[in-house]
């Protein structure tokens, strides 16, 4: 939509977004891209046609949560909404609808933010002045829709699985002409006998003109994940709101639409106030018979079934020819904001009682904003040798006050909320101006819990254990907070060989008392640090060498015994006239006849033995 010289707002409808700094690159009207491989397609579709968005089921495992600092309200576990809560304690539920609005730059309400709990990396929050905010959704209240697209919880509805999952799609930009009709057709993949509820909502763009008009743009989160989405200028979003046009409910009984009796409930008075006819609604279809400028904007279709399936589609309706008449402006790429943190560490450390060693988190960072506040915190929970494995629910670090994190099953074998863990050490860098090397030029204040008896090194990223007792065995979790928000999480299991426990990281929230425990097998095998114990390393080398020597000795003895058996058989059991030996003919008994020197010499010369009538001579024929 041309240059971005002021903040913009975007409707996020993509799946599987990795957290990080929000950037809008090449913000010009571009062709619609397929989310999975970003193949380009036609920008516009013909007027008076029926449009069917492309949907794709392969997406990443992540979920978005909208939340704000409005008044606290009771949380309904059966509702597809999440009620805003302050102190960053909004949490994710298995809801099946999704809608939100991006606002980069000047905020509508600095308390309302968009964040992603299911990734270990940065949350989407850029501070009070440059935060990512949301506006009220659907019926104008402060409830914010969410979606859970964890592939382990849903199957593929298009393949007929019993546990379908929400489906991705590509955005559709529809060009219409004044006084002409247009039809929007959403993708419908239904299962026989399931009751479906469809909702059409509408964000008008009547007050949005020029560069403030909604447009499909290329959006990047961090430097690795980019996608197409609808972007609306912040000034436009302040002057308009989203309306829920209608809701339709029916039970799918067959392939023919005529067999599906449905009920349409018009929940918006927008078009009545404008003295215009509301759009006609059918299952998966929205029709406008005569297009006026009041019908232009963003249409969002959501469908959820009684079996837990959920899907959606987004349409951007604009005047035909707008992109040709709009003055082209050069693309502007905003400077990156926030920070990026990456860590490398071992997930386990085996020690012997009395050892002295260091537990290091190798932290690599790239900070784009200054001044900033940085908190490095070490947390600890003891391990139970009967737990195989220990489970770390990283989502609870982003939502420490969520009920699922504070009250869950099998608490002795899990790490959830930081409120339930012990704080070992922390280092704080406040109002730091040096983004390149904060450890050298910024004042860091460290605090150690004396009960652990550990030493903090390397600016707060390394714990030193001295004369380590068995009681310090446990799961140590390292958390990086940037400007008050969780940016990175890492963990290490410290234990002896006798009480070693594996640990894995889980996505999502832990099961509560009313939910069955997870049945999936661990996907990750925790590596053991090969250099953690000299005694263990020496024993491994010695055992391996002894095994090799023993194997060689066994092979040698087997080969030798086999050769001896074969040789003895050939000498003792060789048949007559073999190639190597043959039996001599019998001669007269020398004791019964007169002996002569000549006969004795002959017998001694040929190596024979005499003493009977069956005198036998063995002669080597090869000589």
Swiss-Prot record:
Q: Which Pfam families match?
A: Herpes_gE (PF02480), Herpes_gE_N (PF20418)
Q: Where are the transmembrane segments?
A: 539-559
Q: Which positions carry Phosphothreonine? A: 596, 598
Q: Reply yes or no: does the keyword Cell inner membrane apply.
A: no
Q: Where is this motif: Internalization motif?
A: 582-585
Where in or outside the cell? Answer: Virion membrane; Host cell membrane; Host cell junction; Host Golgi apparatus membrane
Disulfide topology: 387-413, 396-405, 432-442
Bilayer topology:
Single-pass type I membrane protein; Single-pass membrane protein
Residues making up the signal peptide according to the UniProt record: 1-30
* Function field: Envelope glycoprotein that binds to the potential host cell entry receptor IDE.
Instruction: Give the protein's recorded name.
Output: Envelope glycoprotein E
Please spell out the taxonomic lineage of the organism that makes this protein.
Answer: Viruses, Duplodnaviria, Heunggongvirae, Peploviricota, Herviviricetes
